[in-house]
Amino acid sequence: MPIGQRVVLIGGGPNALVTAFYLAKGGFKPLILERREFVGGGAITEEFYPGFRASTLAHTVGPLRSDIAADMQLEKFQCHMAHPNPRVFAPTPEGKALLFYNDHARTAGGIARFSAKDAGKYIEFADTLAELFPILGQLLSITPPAIDSPSPEDLWNLFKTGRGVRGLGKKRLFDLLRWGPMAAADFVAEFFETELLRAVIAARGIFGTAMGPWSAGTTAVLLLRAAADPHPVGSASFSHGGLGSFTRAMAESARAAGVEIRTDAEVRHIRVKDGAVTGLVLANGEEFPANAVVSGVDPKRTFFHLLDPSQLDPTFALRIKNFRSNGTAAKVHLALNDLPNFPALTDAIAADGFIKALSGRIHIGPDIDYLERAFDASKYGGFSSAPYLDVTIPTLLDPTLAPEGKHVLSAYVQFAPFKLKEGNWDDRRKQLGDTVVRTLATYAPDLPRLIEGIQVTTPQDLETAYGFTGGHIFHGELALDQLFTMRPVLDWARYKTPIRNLFLCGSATHPGNGLTGASGANAAREIIHALR
């Protein structure tokens, strides 16, 4: 395809914005068609109660892969980031707590109040993740190799990665091979004896998934996240103005590179002729001829809603149908008239003050059994009566999100299945919100009386309002059989599809985890290579 030909992208989520940016830099003419009135996908800021705004779905940034951040230069487009320290505050119902700082030695000092042994082990664990980071990080940036006929580039990438792994030594190589299939609960138990410490770290392996800490392969998910950020508890980066400001800056960077963006442009159908895409048709009937189409939406929506399934090979269609994408995460936003008090946050623990201690993420899930019980309910079609929560109070870093002196509390809620066994989400939405408030009140007893308003976003909402089939925040389950060369399906994990010049760039492609931009950048590289 000659340089300068039109490539049309479906959806304006973060990965699509990254893909379009690099396509423009590569000399193509990308056009993004976004069905909503603004871009951002799951990384947007919206008013959920009069005067109160929140990052509706995602509430922290990836972190964005460092090379992408350097290329897009988001700070030039008024993207201002905050990186709170400590990153995580983890209370227990009994009034104890841990704080996780950037400084591992300082964190270890707090852990020593629970276990002197674990204080030393925490340093060892952090060093282990830091040791693995360069190797695991490489995997985020490569295209999964072709299984049947790997290209010279595939072999070179595997050689580089293999050489790095070999450099770790036989013991560490054995550790990696053993750890990947393990349950996160077993993995953390090899290092720690303190239940709260185990739970906070194991939670990285289950966040956003339909798995509990005793599920096989959750250590692989934990290590996948460590490949993006080697800190034991992960990232806690926020954008001033909410994540909508982050994706707005991405859109401005893409426009500056030559990307055209149209909002309120819902794609109804992908046109195909003789096995190749020819363009798109919008819901209003408007047609867009295209030499190539890149879908930033999930595979099931792409192949079963935007394409005629009869154009697909039956084996491929069955694999896509079997791609697990039913989510178990909900989101609850609270409009508060004051900052809640957490009794576990004592002067002895919060040496830098309560505001700093609460400015990162707040982990609600005091032990492994608690996390597993929260997961159990979803296996049988119910939501957790005592859910695992990943909480932020973004107004501590950005007071503009609420009226003066008031606050926003935002909570990811697990586990809440897409399909309920009894009732429906419209009927049980309030019950889920009440459950979250009751759970939070265990740790912050004054919170219920501070609430002015509440918004509950269910997995069903993620499908109907945001277009995530099955309500999965990562477009598909992060399980061992749906990672790397099998994401989304075997034989088609290289961002291409069986339809010529139709590509995928969303979170259902490798590596498919959080706001790192990696799926989008990898897809752009393969698209440029295929079209030149």
Residue spans for each PLM region:
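N-terminal glycine-rich phosphate/pyrophosphate-binding loop and immediately adjacent elements
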Residues: 2-148
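FAD cofactor-binding and catalytic pocket of flavoenzymes
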Residues: 74-78, 306-410, 461, 467-488, ...
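Active-site/ligand-binding neighborhood in enzyme catalytic cores
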Residues: 130-257, 468-483
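A glycine-rich dinucleotide-binding beta-alpha-beta segment and adjacent secondary-structure elements
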Residues: 194, 198-214, 365, 381-394, ...
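Glycine-rich loop(s) and the adjacent beta-strand/alpha-helix scaffold that form part
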Residues: 236-249, 253-257, 270-271, 281-346
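A conserved short coil-to-beta-strand element within the FAD-binding core of flavoproteins
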Residues: 263-277
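Flavin-binding catalytic cores
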Residues: 313, 339-340, 376-385, 425-464
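A conserved FAD-binding loop/helix module that cradles the flavin
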Residues: 507-528
